[in-house]
Amino acid sequence: LTVTKDLKVSVKAPVGCPQKTIDDFVLSHEKWINEHIEKQKSRLSLEKTLDEKRVSELRALAAAELPRRVEYYSEKMGLYPASVKITSAATRFGSCSGKNSICFSYRLMLYPPEAVDYVVVHELAHIKEKNHSARFYALVERYMPDYREREKLLKKTPKL
């Protein structure tokens, strides 16, 4: 179940799944669907608000700041990425590849430094734990005991 960028609801179901089962599933997830439609609307609004100059400024800030934050937390955690890149990703703040390359969206710079540091620690933790298991979150918590509060900051619409 997903909500696309153009605000359409997409449902994937096994071949042969009865239409009634699909309809019932969608109806039972109406609240979730409405919440995610609103999130997509916020993202679309943000996209329209960011002009080229502001995007350029955010990219420059990300390129200057994020490698420094990665270096700082890499030393603390003993986890070192193969590379650090800045992207234009709109639906995720960061990612860590199977080869331990870390990418961060320049949009992360719209959030408070505490939230930025959480994303850095989160992605570095993926170097050791490639999933979101209990061990992964224990590792994140070891280096950032208040990560849950920091994570909540990312759920709010950023200040432009």
Indicate residue ranges for each PLM-predicted region.
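Walker B catalytic acidic pair
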Residues: 123
